[in-house]
From Swiss-Prot:
<keyword id="KW-0067">ATP-binding</keyword>
<dbReference type="InterPro" id="IPR012089">
    <property type="entry name" value="tRNA_Cyd_32_2_STrfase"/>
</dbReference>
<keyword id="KW-0694">RNA-binding</keyword>
<feature type="region of interest" description="Disordered">
    <location>
        <begin position="1"/>
        <end position="20"/>
    </location>
</feature>
<keyword id="KW-0819">tRNA processing</keyword>
<keyword id="KW-0004">4Fe-4S</keyword>
<keyword id="KW-0411">Iron-sulfur</keyword>
<feature type="compositionally biased region" description="Low complexity">
    <location>
        <begin position="282"/>
        <end position="293"/>
    </location>
</feature>
<dbReference type="InterPro" id="IPR011063">
    <property type="entry name" value="TilS/TtcA_N"/>
</dbReference>
<dbReference type="Pfam" id="PF01171">
    <property type="entry name" value="ATP_bind_3"/>
</dbReference>
<comment type="similarity">
    <text>Belongs to the TtcA family.</text>
</comment>
<keyword id="KW-0479">Metal-binding</keyword>
<comment type="function">
    <text>Catalyzes the ATP-dependent 2-thiolation of cytidine in position 32 of tRNA, to form 2-thiocytidine (s(2)C32). The sulfur atoms are provided by the cysteine/cysteine desulfurase (IscS) system.</text>
</comment>
<dbReference type="GO" id="GO:0016783">
    <property type="term" value="F:sulfurtransferase activity"/>
</dbReference>
<comment type="subunit">
    <text>Homodimer.</text>
</comment>
<feature type="short sequence motif" description="PP-loop motif">
    <location>
        <begin position="59"/>
        <end position="64"/>
    </location>
</feature>
<protein>
    <recommendedName>
        <fullName>tRNA-cytidine(32) 2-sulfurtransferase</fullName>
        <ecNumber>2.8.1.-</ecNumber>
    </recommendedName>
</protein>
Length: 305
């Protein structure tokens, strides 16, 4: 009896035995994944157009470093030409290492500017001791950056908010403001003068942290508000971290849901015409009673009263 030998299996690429090689391979995969996610977000929301001048708001934190790094890499192979300028707002915080960002940016060869504005003194004077400074600090910082964009021909303002920021903002609005709202990947500023983009909208914070560590970015901690405890955001952040541990994929599903809104399955009358639903044929809308009439009827005395 002739024995049937099994067919030889194709040889897979052997895993590197050297831990350093394994780490390098993992870092390479991570970088490619981030590039793909950033490129997808730019494409999905039309974030960058030919000839755009994109201002990358660089704080010295892991998110903005990663944002700049990704855009620099994509710029070299992007389907459209665009320029970049990195802008940091020096808020005159005590002990702020003002030399770090200029040295880093000169090493990259990227155009940059340092905008000096003493928002630290303003925030410290206005906000009572022990209170979170984040809200006022954010408004002042945004105003200074918008002013720079207005006077320097910037067409897009790129911020470093990531997927977890967007989901956390959704829950903060839900829990504390009773509204369904998050952070838009692309928006026009309230004054209508600026277009703001968030190219990291599809990127997990954990991936950004790992990438920043691998790239050894010179992280600058925020001594004004970044080290303060914003209780609401902290609580939501812990909730998302718990879900990530116990229910992998749940936060990703929530993020995807923000792009699949069904107004007819909610209760916002400004988004869906519930009054027209079920109206027969071409019946004019003026045949519907004034909604206030139903309220009046509910409060009217009964015949037996």
């Amino acid at each position: 009896m002739t024995a049937v030998l099994p067919l030889p299996q194709p040889l897979a690429d052997p895993a590197p035995r050297d831990p350093r090689q394994r780490l390098q391979r993992e870092q390479l995969r991570l970088g490619k994944r981030l590039q793909r996610q950033v490129g997808q977000a730019i494409a999905d929301f039309g974030m960058i157009a030919p000839g755009d001048k994109v201002m990358v708001c660089l704080s010295g934190g892991k998110d903005s470093y990663t944002l700049l790094d990704m855009l620099l890499q994509l710029q070299r192979k992007a389907p459209v030409p665009f320029s970049l300028v990195a802008v940091n707002l020096d808020q005159k915080q005590p002990d702020f290492p003002a030399h770090v960002l200029p040295a880093y940016l000169r090493g990259l060869g990227v155009p940059f500017d340092i905008v000096e504005q003493d928002t630290y003194s303003v925030v410290s004077r206005v906000i009572p001791a022990g209170k979170t400074m984040c809200s006022l600090c954010s408004r002042l910082r945004r105003g200074a950056l918008y002013a720079y964009a207005q006077t320097h021909g910037v067409t897009k303002i790129a911020l470093g908010h990531h997927r977890d920021d967007i989901v956390a903002t959704f829950f903060m609005n839900l829990f504390h403001h009773a509204r369904l709202a998050a952070m838009a990947p692309k928006l026009r500023s309230d004054d209508g003068a600026h277009v703001v983009i968030r190219p990291l909208a599809y990127v997990r914070e954990a991936d950004i942290a790992a990438y920043a560590q691998a790239r050894q970015f010179p992280i600058i901690p925020c001594n004004l508000c970044g080290s303060q405890e914003n209780l609401q955001r902290q609580q939501v952040g812990k909730l998302l971290q718990q879900w990530d541990r116990e229910f992998p994929g749940r936060v990703e599903q929530i993020a995807r849901a923000l792009g699949d809104v069904r107004p007819e399955q909610l209760a916002d009358r400004t988004l869906f015409d519930f009054l027209a639903l079920g109206r027969s044929g071409d019946a004019p809308s003026d045949v519907d009673p004034d909604p206030s009439a139903w309220l009046s009827a509910s409060h009217a005395p009964h015949d037996s009263d």
